[in-house]
Amino acid sequence: MKRLLLFFLPAVLLLAACSTTKAIPEGEQLYTGIDEITYTERPTASTKKQADSTGVITAVADAVTTVSDVLQGKTKAESLLSASKPLDEKAQKKEEKRLAKQMEEDFATAKEEVEAVLAYPPNNAIFGSSSMSWPWKVGLWVHNGFAHSKGKFGKWILKHFGTSPVLVSQVSPEMRVKVATNTLHNYGFFRGKVTYDILTQKNPKKARIAYHVRAGKVYRLDSIAYLNYPSAMDSILRAHSAARLLKSGEAFSVVNLSDEQTRIEKLMKENGYYFYKAAYTTFRADTIMRPGFVQLQVQPIASRPKEADRPWYIGNVHVHLRRNENDVTDKTLRRRRYTYSFSGDKMPLRASVWRHAIAHRSGEKYRLSDYQTTMEKIGAMGVLSQMDLSYVPRDTSALAGDTLDLVIHAVMDKLFDSTFEMNATFKSNQQVGPGVSYELSKRNAFRGGEKVSFKIFGSYEWQTGAGAEGGNSLLNSYELGTALTFRFPRFVFPGVSRRRQRFPATTDFVIDADWKNRSGFFQMVSMGLEATYGWHKRATRQHKLTLFSLDFDRLLTTTSNFEKIMADNPALYVSMRNQFIPAMSYTYTYQSPSTRRDAWWMQFHVKEAGHVTSLIYAAAGKSLSQRDKELFGNPFAQFVKFTAEHRRTFRLNQSLSLASRVFAGVVCSYGNSQAAPYAEQFYVGGANSIRAFTVRSIGPGSYKPSSSRYSYMDQTGDVRLEANVELRARLIGDLCGAVFLDAGNVWLLRPDANRPGAQLTASSLRHIALGTGAGIRYDLDFIVLRFDVGIGLHMPYHTEKSGFYNIPRFKDGIGLHFAIGYPF
């Protein structure tokens, strides 16, 4: 060790003595970052005069619209009176506040974009910062020492450990201030300007850059007129005027102009105008008539093609389907307005599948949403390796043509797919063991886009270290299981199967079985059936409804030792006894659009078990409150479970983000059950929860279990509350780091004499486990490898140590987790 230090310390000192500017070319300077950006002539909150004028402009614009609507019979003449009323004092103050807030938001948006243009990290930047860097610039030292090396070793060192210096000329501040100035103009700051200074440091070969931003007054939209559109298109624009992105009084923004072009294009295509494009909308702006304001005219360009001015209707559908890319489509099948060309004796994908997948209807107007749904439904089947969808005018020579034929060219994907997975585990309770799984899937199993998957899996675990007694493992366990899944790319239900939905839908039928063996304790078999329906009408909203789910858990054999454990814990006995779980559930998931800067996700899940079965018993004359009702000779579970989860990620800059999660859940057993099944209860701890503590090692409430090796079986609850926050930063290349804070616990809804302090009360909410820690992540694009070190700060029960930090020994509060994927 001493020899290693004797070698390592001089090496570090030698590198530290190296100059970071040794290899800087003559006339160049090493870029060391930017100073804090200075802002002058920042826009201030609107004065009363400005608010008055804008209010008048808005009122006049509204009045003009009202008069136009009255003349066209779209509204009553009485509306003219309300349109002519001036703003009262209360409304005036409200308008002032709105404009002041809007001005702050406008400047904040422009400021963010300008800073993004000016940002450029120096060598060894701290988390991608443009102003701060680490003092140990090893990459630069290596580059300076080996930049002119001609030997193989020197070149290898330079390639793998060297970092080229970032020069001021490479940063190109002149170009950046021009782009930043143009960015200000794009956001309505027409008089804005960005300048810079080169700040040479003590070492003349080093320099920082100081940027100065003069924002000036933001120009706002005055009157906005949509002119020269054909009458039919003008009516469409008026009918959707509430969705306009350009509004009087708001800041002029090129971004908003572009978004309005896109909105008009989508609106027209949704109403049949297939050939209308965003580029066909143009703007005329006048900034002279009223200083500080922009009078805007929105109109179509005169050079647009004539076919863009009329709606188009769907005609026939032509599908060209090949099994392989080089196949010749020598067979033809006609079904009404559908024509299918394919290779082979049978069409690989049945005609009915195409009719269900294509949302367009012959004779109806082309709609953009139908095109998007068609692409999504065909793609969701996963049976095609290639697909091209195009719309062809039926009569290109006729100026009055209005019919589009849909033409699809597609190539089938390979039929079979297999997946083999192998993993090794090392758990905090000293259980280790391997696990393997193999899944074989057949696509397009019945020529209807179906997917049939058969999966087998197995695992083996044994207790090590303190768990071993006399050379024999205290707990040997193995598990064998299988699952058969049938997925249909549509609803499969009586009376619904033949209907054509204009939205993507799936149906999953699952049959599964699982056999668990815990040597010296029990053998259990679990079997299940499930029918689940999924659909979404919008890409951001997902629905999943399980209409039927029946699980059966049966203990095949038990030992006297296990019987004693269950006798000491009645709740554990109820949750692990032989029982049926007939259930239904619904899950709603929302995910923000990908264009949103700060992404967020939320999910609500509700599940009930045994209620329908109990109603059937009630119809047969048995009381709803009667306990120990049986299904096929075994009791069935009754409970209601609800969970809610919200996740949000705030992107602070390109290399730094703040992720958060809040989770709440409750499960309430009733009727035939005193406790919910063990698998339905909540727990905290582990790699994706409170990372300072292992799985099922906290709670419920302030209950502290005995030191029994199996006490983790007691540490589940009926209620779970948890919150997590994590600061994520990109370190080097694909290597990322994180620091986190986790808090939460589980509680019982009912008192339990065997677990004092476990019940949820107003005072027990303060019994929260708290942990912090740090970790690294290696992002391989297709997979994220994660290693976290959790550090306990507070346990929810009393310990031998007083104070908020009540971890008896520091090492007792350390949790190590190796996992795949992000925790949330």
Regions found by a protein language model. Name each.
Residues 2, 19-380, 403:
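Interaction-mediating elements
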Residues 2-9:
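Sec-dependent signal peptide recognition
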Residues 15-17:
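C-terminal motif of bacterial Sec signal peptides marking the signal peptidase cleavage site
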Residues 42, 197-199, 212-218, 226-231, ...:
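Solvent-exposed coil/turn segments that connect beta secondary-structure elements
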Residues 340, 344, 425-429, 544-729, ...:
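C-terminal outer-membrane beta-barrel translocator/porin domains of Gram-negative envelope proteins
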Residues 424-425, 442-444, 489, 753-780, ...:
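Strand-loop-strand
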Residues 378, 440, 486, 604, ...:
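Hydrophobic, well-ordered secondary-structure elements that form the walls
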Residues 233-236, 347-348, 367-603, 691-692, ...:
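Gram-negative/organellar outer-membrane beta-barrel architecture
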